Amino acid sequence: METKTAKILDGKTLAEKIQKELTAQIIDAQAKIGRPPGLAVLMVGDNPASAAYVRNKEKSCAKVGIASFGKHFPQETTQTELEDVIAALNQDEQVDGILVQLPLPEHLDAVKLLHQIEPDKDADGLHPVNLGRLVRGEKGLRSCTPAGVMRLLAEYEISLRGKQAVVVGRSILVGKPMALMLLEADATVTIAHSRSQDLKSITQNADILIAAAGLPGLITADMVKPGAVVVDVGINRVSDAHGKSRLVGDINFASIAGVAEYITPVPGGIGPMTVALLLQNTVTSYLQTAKESGALDVK
């Protein structure tokens, strides 16, 4: 008897496709605007994982033609110092996107810092104004990870209209904006979280299951409806018996691949899409600013 295996939603390949599209857009626009798009990434301290993420973003920027303004601050940098830097970047005409790399040292207020970013330069799509635009169904910069999920589902022509969608996780980074974007696409949405009772009975009803709780292996095969679309947003670093670390998601990939219709891997699923949508947000801001200034014809 042939064993069924889920089709892979390949975020890495789609991210490369998006990067090529952005490169072409930038080449065309830069000839008229006279400068490339610019992304400022602010990092505080020496968290190795954060440093790796920042390097990856800078490398991706270079690949598509975005100027990267990396700013690395010592661990003891104060809230006021960072707010002053953000205020200057808000006024800098070379900068179209601003990103604060999380997590920050405990003495810093990340939410307050994010609020200082000019909404139209909010590359991560986390400013209250942009989240408010999402709630109202208005145009605005969208949170990168959930926007990446939506783009990946669209690429594979997975219909969401009328489907039962379950989001496991309620963070402002992923869970809440993810639920709103699914609602925008006419899905019927349930949000589950750490306080939800009988999580299994909730997830078993999902046609579309988004795991975004940050808990390795939380979702197992018996929690998944046969033929479901399972998207793993979790990025968790775990160590094996030999102390070697690796990245895993929130789902048990091997077992769920035998139940689901579509599945995303970790790594290579949503991670590359998050970076691609960060670049896209930066280019969107770049083009919008140019149109408003008259450097580009409004189309």
From Swiss-Prot:
Key words, A-Z: Amino-acid biosynthesis, Histidine biosynthesis, Hydrolase, Methionine biosynthesis, Multifunctional enzyme, NADP, One-carbon metabolism, Oxidoreductase, Purine biosynthesis
Binding sites annotated in the UniProt record for NADP(+): G169, R170, S171, S194, I235
EC numbers, comma separated: 1.5.1.5, 3.5.4.9
Pfam families cross-referenced by the UniProt entry: THF_DHG_CYH, THF_DHG_CYH_C
GO BP terms: L-histidine biosynthetic process; methionine biosynthetic process; purine nucleotide biosynthetic process; tetrahydrofolate interconversion
Statement: the UniProt record of this protein carries the keyword NADP: yes
Keyword match Hydrolase: yes
PROSITE patterns per UniProt: THF_DHG_CYH_2
Listed pathway(s): One-carbon metabolism; tetrahydrofolate interconversion
Enzymatic reactions: (6R)-5,10-methylene-5,6,7,8-tetrahydrofolate + NADP(+) = (6R)-5,10-methenyltetrahydrofolate + NADPH; (6R)-5,10-methenyltetrahydrofolate + H2O = (6R)-10-formyltetrahydrofolate + H(+)
Domain of life: Bacteria
Single GO term (MF): methylenetetrahydrofolate dehydrogenase (NADP+) activity
NCBIfam families in UniProt: PRK10792.1, PRK14186.1
Subunit note: Homodimer.
Family statement drawn from the similarity comment of this UniProt entry: Belongs to the tetrahydrofolate dehydrogenase/cyclohydrolase family.
HAMAP family: THF_DHG_CYH
Role description: Catalyzes the oxidation of 5,10-methylenetetrahydrofolate to 5,10-methenyltetrahydrofolate and then the hydrolysis of 5,10-methenyltetrahydrofolate to 10-formyltetrahydrofolate.
Name the record gives this protein: Bifunctional protein FolD
Organism annotation: Nostoc sp. (strain PCC 7120 / SAG 25.82 / UTEX 2576)
Gene that encodes it: folD
